[in-house]
């Protein structure tokens, strides 16, 4: 890979967004461009994530101020990204969803666990972003332009069986 890719995280003040930010700050091919939070807009990242003090000078911006990037990570509550898909998908060619919005392909199964899906027409677009190899006890991220990241329950059991 040549050059760094710019990355922005929507919902970076939460646990999943904060952990993704922590990892991205150390990645040799990523440059974190923006992080959003409505509640903490204008505050430095370390105000919410003290473990990142001295690692970045980024400040939270409101989602409305989000600029285009190469990669957009969405760490929003379940259902929010799906409802605002058109807005966010226009900002980056690569989307990584940390919520449950696009983990399941079957709208009936989604309804069973999360309620009615706001955009069932998009369920087939996202790739489940982790492949687990139970024989080797490992996993790998698969490349795609729209990734649905599994929760811990989806990855951990095969690794420890």
Annotate each predicted stretch with a short phrase.
Residues 1-161:
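N-terminal Rossmann-like NAD(P) cofactor-binding subdomain of oxidoreductases
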């Amino acid at each position: 890979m040549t050059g760094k890719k710019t990355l922005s995280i929507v919902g970076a003040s939460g646990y999943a967004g904060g952990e993704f930010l922590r990892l991205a700050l150390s990645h040799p091919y990523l440059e974190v461009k923006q992080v959003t939070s409505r509640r903490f807009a204008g505050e430095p990242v370390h105000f919410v994530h003290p473990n990142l003090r001295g690692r970045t000078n980024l400040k939270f911006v409101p989602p409305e101020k989000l600029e285009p990037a190469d990669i957009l990570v969405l760490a929003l509550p379940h259902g929010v990204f799906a409802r605002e898909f058109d807005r966010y998908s226009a900002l980056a060619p690569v989307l990584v969803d940390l919520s449950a919005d696009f983990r399941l392909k079957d709208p009936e199964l989604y309804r069973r666990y999360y309620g009615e899906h706001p955009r069932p027409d998009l369920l087939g677009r996202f790739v489940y972003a982790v492949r687990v190899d139970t024989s080797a006890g490992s996993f790998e991220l698969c490349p795609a332009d729209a990734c649905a990241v599994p929760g811990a329950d989806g990855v951990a059991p095969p690794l420890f069986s």
